[in-house]
Each structure stands twice: as structure tokens, then as C-alpha cells.
């Protein structure tokens, strides 16, 4: 086979339109046409078998034909009305996720008093949600890769809506424990909205738009606190659970408009559906479709865990798992630490305060006051500066450096908490730390869907989300249990963990800034041919992504 390929020695210069990932680098010439000297004797391309056993697609038999891939169409159509609608719709799912998470800090103390629950049962009510999320994240990613992004997202949202509403009618503790665990199981699939959303975005708008739906997370947390301020004193926690499901209900009503990812359709061989979706986007945006024939990527197994550990992605997967673990571990740890630090006034007062306080009955409780809700509100508002900072730097520094910057600044703020400082400085440090650790989360949500190919994108994001839930499960034992014995050791654990995450971000093999979304885990055969020609004839080659 190699002899056949390299016998192409005496053919004249041909001109063809470059397609696929190699044509979509930001540094490519605008024309997209290149002269390549091919020498040798023509052979029948349709019958050639590549080294990996993949037949050459017939679409490439005549290289002068106009062809395009989904990425080319998305770039040509651009950002418009369709993407704005999609932003709002996927943002609703993200907002609902934030509200279901924020309600944990409101529901737990209420049930602690109303049902006279011991402290360990209150803690279990929070932990069971994270257990559900951790156990389902990989499953939802697999479903989205196997059966479609739209299918996985719709099922997870409807699942969460159903059990979220049932939670409001739970008669006893055991019922609400099971139902909230099932809610957590459904929430584990909501991050797949990022996968679907990213696959419809042109390259230059992708980072900003993914950060845009992260704003919906911040809006959801603020809205949940405001809702609790007005609902809890008069109507109670059952009505709060019902009203908190409103964004999910709205999504369920509007999801009939949601299209399936054209990238997924192409990868699964549904060319007609992919073209129909692209034409629909072009019509809504008032933009023309690219001329030519849509190239169907070679079909391959989707949603296989082993694909995350191929030589090309093994190191990336392991580093991302640690980064996501550290992110959630530190984010939720800071949320828990904030209450303790505010109550004590500063770090130096915590140990003495805990020694002075007599042991209390585990059934003793206090309902949240309006002042408590306002403190929660001010804390959640720190999410917005994190979005703004990440939005400003992510396309300037790149994804890897942005994550590293956020983790390192959080680590420094944690170390500064060792100093005996006043409440005002304490508040400032906590807000800066919260802003940057949330910014690290946002940057990770941009990077992860970009680095994996379409065949494993949902699974990759799902497994990373699952590792984040492991961090969220562990962090109460550090922020609450370890804090009882040593506040300095607790702060050192969070600071050290994020410092290591910053180093891990720098060691990620691939920088995705200015890089097109990869359609397949294998190179397109056209790229393979150009690569071989480069080695033998010195023709320059454009990579679709940079590796450092």
C-alpha cells in the first residue's frame, strides 16, 4: 500500500479545496486553496485501504469537488438568532441545576428544625445528592454519545423535574432522602447541555458563549436565595421545592425546538438530518449554506471509556480528572468555610471559639433568618466577577493558562487567611477566592468539550463531572470535620490542592484556543495523505490544534 501511495510521482500540479480540521486553523489563508505537487502514477483511490484498515471515502475520489464538513458550515453560518435562542434554552437547564444545588443550603437547616433531625442525617441529605450526581455523570455522558446529545439532555432534565416535584410531597425523612438522591442522579446529566451548546458555536465565539451560560448558574443561585427570602417565611420549604422546578418545567415545554447536534448526526451516519439541521440554522441566522457536498465522517464506536485512555488522550484525561476534582473540592469547601469564618470573625478566633463553646445536643437548631439569607446572597454575587475575569482572559492567555491563573490566585488567597485579619479584609479575600475558583470551573467547562472529539466529547465531560462530585463528597470532611481540630491544616489542604491543580493545568498536552472542535478520534484520511506528502516532499501542513 505504501508503494502505491508513494508512486504518485509524475502527476501535474493540482489545486483542491482543503476541507476538514486541517483547513480550519485561524492561521489558514482565506482562500483555502493550496498548490501541492504530486508525482507518480495515478491509482484507484476508491479501492485503497489505509494503514488502520479504513477505506478511503468516495467523496475524496475527485479532489476538485467542493466539499465541506460540519465545522466549515458552522463557521460559515456564524453566530446569530439560532445561537441566541439556544443560549437561553440551555441556560435554563443550567440555571435549574444551580437552583437545585443552592437549595441544599436552605433545605437542610429547615428540615433539621422541623423534623428534629440529628446532625448526621442533615449532612446525609446533602451527601446523597452528590452521590447521585457522581454515580450518573458517566452514564449520562455515555447516553449522549450513544443516542444523541438532545436525547440525553431531555431525559436527564425530565428525570430531575419529576423527582424534584415529588420531593415537595415527601411525608418523612426516608422519602425525601431517596427522592433527593434521584434528583441528584438527574442533575448529573445537565452538564451535557454544554456539549450540545458547544457543537453549534463558531470557533471565535465558543469560549465567550460557554461562559455566557455559566452566567445562568450565577443567576440561578441568586434567584434561589431571593425566592427563599419571600417563600420560606410564609409558604414553607415544600412550596420552595415546587417553585424551584420552574426553569426545568419551562425547558421541558420548549425542548421540542431543540435540534440534535449536526456533529453527532454526521458521526452516526445521518447525513440528511445533519444537512437539515444546518439549513435550519442558516435560515434562522439569515446566512448562506456552504456550497458543495457534506462529508460524512467515518462511523466509529461512540461513548467507549477506553477511548479516553488512548495514547493521545490518556494524559489529558488523567490531568483533567484531577483538575475537576480539585475545582469542586475547593469550591464547595470554600462555601462551607465561609460560614465558619464569618461566625468567628477571623481564622485566629476559630480554635478558641470552638473550645469555649460547650457541646450541644445534635437536635439543637436555628431557623435561617433574613440576615442569613442576605449573607448567602452577598456570597453568591461573587460568582459574577469570576465570570467577567475569565471572559476577559480566556481568549488572551488561552484555556490552560486561565485555569492555572485561577487556581494559583485561589491558593494564594487561602494562604493569606492564615494571617489574623479583620472582618473586612477577610470578606475581601473570601470574595476574591470565590471569584477565581468559580472562574477556574468556568474555564474547565470551556476547555473540556473542546479537547475531546465528537465521538467521546459527552463521555469525557461526564467523567470529569463525576470526578468533580467525588471532590464535593469529600470536602465536608475537610471543611467541617478537620476544621474542628486544625484550621491551619484545613486551609493548607485547600491551598495545596489548588496549587497542584494549577501545575496540572500547565502540563495539559493540548491548548484548545483557536482550535476547531475535532470530529473524530482518528485523523481524516485527507490529512493523513497531506502529512505523508509533507514528510516526503516538504509540503507545509497545518495542524488543527497545538500541542505543547
Swiss-Prot record:
It is found in: Cytoplasmic vesicle, Secretory vesicle, Synaptic vesicle membrane. Residues 109-122, 178-180, 231-238, 338-373, 423-424, 479-489 are vesicular. Residues 533-548 have a biased composition (Polar residues). One of its GO terms (molecular function) is transmembrane transporter activity. Signal peptide: none annotated. Residues 521-548 are annotated as: Disordered. One of its GO terms (cellular component) is synaptic vesicle membrane. The modification Phosphoserine is found at residues 25, 31, 542. Residues 1-87, 144-156, 202-209, 260-316, 395-401, 446-457, 511-548 are cytoplasmic. This is Synaptic vesicle 2-related protein. It comes from Mus musculus. The gene is Svop.
Amino acid at each position: 500500500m505504501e508503494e502505491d501511495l508513494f508512486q504518485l510521482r509524475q502527476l501535474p500540479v493540482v489545486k483542491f479545496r482543503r476541507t476538514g480540521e486541517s483547513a480550519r486553523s485561524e492561521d489558514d489563508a482565506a482562500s483555502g486553496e493550496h498548490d501541492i505537487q504530486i508525482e507518480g502514477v495515478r491509482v484507484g483511490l476508491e479501492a485503497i485501504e489505509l494503514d488502520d484498515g479504513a477505506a478511503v471515502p468516495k467523496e475524496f475520489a475527485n479532489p476538485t469537488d467542493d466539499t465541506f464538513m460540519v465545522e466549515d458550515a458552522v463557521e460559515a453560518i456564524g453566530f446569530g438568532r439560532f445561537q441566541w435562542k439556544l443560549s437561553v434554552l440551555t441556560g435554563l437547564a443550567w440555571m435549574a441545576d444551580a437552583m437545585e444545588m443552592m437549595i441544599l443550603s436552605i433545605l437542610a437547616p429547615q428540615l433539621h428544625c422541623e423534623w428534629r433531625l440529628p446532625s448526621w442525617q442533615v449532612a446525609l441529605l446533602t451527601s446523597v445528592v452528590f452521590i447521585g450526581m457522581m454515580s450518573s455523570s458517566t452514564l449520562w455522558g455515555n447516553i449522549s454519545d450513544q443516542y444523541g446529545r438532545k436525547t440525553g439532555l431531555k431525559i436527564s432534565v425530565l428525570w430531575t423535574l419529576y423527582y424534584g416535584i415529588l420531593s415537595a410531597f415527601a411525608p418523612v425523612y426516608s422519602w425525601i432522602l431517596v427522592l433527593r438522591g434521584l434528583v441528584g442522579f438527574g442533575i448529573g446529566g445537565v452538564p451535557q447541555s454544554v456539549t450540545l451548546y458547544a457543537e453549534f458555536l463558531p470557533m471565535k465565539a465558543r469560549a465567550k458563549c460557554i461562559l455566557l451560560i455559566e452566567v445562568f448558574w450565577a443567576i440561578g443561585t441568586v434567584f434561589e436565595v431571593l425566592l427563599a427570602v419571600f417563600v420560606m417565611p410564609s409558604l414553607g420549604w415544600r412550596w420552595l421545592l415546587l417553585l424551584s422546578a420552574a426553569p426545568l418545567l419551562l425547558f421541558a415545554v420548549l425542548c421540542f425546538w431543540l435540534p440534535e447536534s449536526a456533529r453527532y448526526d454526521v458521526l452516526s451516519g445521518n447525513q440528511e438530518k445533519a444537512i437539515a439541521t444546518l439549513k435550519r440554522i442558516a435560515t434562522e441566522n439569515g446566512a448562506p449554506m456552504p456550497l458543495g457536498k457534506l462529508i460524512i465522517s467515518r462511523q466509529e464506536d461512540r461513548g467507549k471509556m477506553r477511548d479516553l485512555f488512548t495514547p493521545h488522550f490518556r494524559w489529558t484525561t488523567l490531568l483533567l480528572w484531577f483538575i475537576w476534582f480539585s475545582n469542586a473540592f475547593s469550591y464547595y469547601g470554600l462555601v462551607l468555610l465561609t460560614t465558619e469564618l464569618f461566625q468567628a470573625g477571623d481564622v485566629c478566633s476559630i480554635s478558641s471559639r470552638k473550645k469555649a463553646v460547650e457541646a450541644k445536643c445534635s437536635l439543637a437548631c436555628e431557623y435561617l433568618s433574613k440576615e442569613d439569607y442576605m449573607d448567602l446572597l452577598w456570597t453568591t454575587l461573587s460568582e459574577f466577577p469570576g465570570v467577567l475575569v475569565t471572559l476577559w482572559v480566556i481568549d488572551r492567555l488561552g484555556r490552560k493558562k486561565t485555569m492555572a491563573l485561577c487556581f494559583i490566585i485561589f491558593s494564594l488567597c487561602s494562604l493569606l487567611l492564615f494571617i489574623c485579619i479583620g472582618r473586612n479584609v477577610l470578606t475581601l479575600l473570601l470574595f476574591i477566592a470565590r471569584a477565581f475558583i468559580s472562574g477556574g470551573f468556568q474555564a474547565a467547562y470551556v476547555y473540556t468539550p473542546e479537547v475531546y472529539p465528537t465521538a467521546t466529547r459527552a463521555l469525557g465531560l461526564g467523567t470529569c463531572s463525576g470526578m468533580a462530585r467525588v471532590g464535593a463528597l469529600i470536602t465536608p470532611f475537610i471543611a467541617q470535620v478537620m476544621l474542628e481540630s486544625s484550621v491551619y491544616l484545613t486551609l493548607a489542604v485547600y491551598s495545596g490542592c489548588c496549587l497542584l491543580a494549577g501545575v496540572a493545568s500547565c502540563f495539559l498536552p493540548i491548548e484548545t484556543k483557536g482550535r476547531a472542535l475535532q470530529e473524530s478520534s482518528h485523523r481524516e484520511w485527507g490529512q493523513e495523505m497531506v502529512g505523508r506528502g509533507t514528510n516526503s516532499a516538504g509540503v507545509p501542513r497545518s495542524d488543527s490544534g497545538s500541542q505543547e
